[in-house]
Design a protein with these regions (language model features):
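TRNA-recognition modules of translation machinery and tRNA-sensing kinases, especially anticodon-binding
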Residues: 1-126
Length: 126
C-alpha cells in the first residue's frame, strides 16, 4: 500500500505528482499511498524472477489511491485490475494484452468502450 515517491517520478510514473497522497517516514523519505500497481509488480518480477528467460504473465486486483480535487486533500480509493506480460517486447505481446483487455471488457457486459494506449513506442511500431 505504501511506496517510495521516487518510484512514481515523471519518467516512470502514471499519476501526476499533485495527485499523490504523500507523507514522510521516520527517515525523512517521501512515501505515497500507492497510485498504481505496475511498478510494484515490476519490482517483484525483478527481485523474484530475475533468472527467468521465458514469458511471464501476471494479473492482479489491488487498491490504489489518488488525491482528487486541487488542494482539497480528498483521497479517492480505486480498485485497479491489471495484467502484465514480461520478457516479451514484441508487437505480438502488445496485441495479446490489447486483445485480453477487450475480451475482459466484453465479458464484463460492456458493449461500448474506448481504449487509450499511452506508449509512444507502440505507435512508432505501427
Amino acid at each position: 500500500m505504501f511506496e517510495y515517491f521516487d518510484i512514481f517520478n515523471k519518467e516512470r510514473g502514471t499519476a501526476a505528482s499533485n495527485e499523490m497522497f504523500k507523507f514522510f517516514d521516520r527517515g525523512n523519505n517521501t512515501l505515497v499511498l500507492r497510485p498504481d500497481m505496475t511498478p510494484a509488480i515490476a519490482r517483484c518480477v525483478a527481485k523474484y524472477f530475475r533468472e527467468e528467460t521465458e514469458q511471464m504473465r501476471f494479473c492482479y486486483t489491488a487498491q490504489t489511491f489518488v488525491s482528487t480535487g486541487q488542494y482539497k486533500g480528498k483521497l479517492q480509493e480505486v480498485t485497479q485490475v491489471g495484467a502484465e506480460l514480461f520478457m516479451d517486447d514484441s508487437s505480438d505481446a502488445d496485441a495479446e494484452m490489447l486483445a485480453l483487455t477487450i475480451e475482459c471488457l466484453l465479458e464484463s457486459g460492456l458493449k461500448e468502450f474506448q481504449i487509450e494506449v499511452g506508449h509512444a513506442d507502440l505507435f512508432r511500431a505501427l
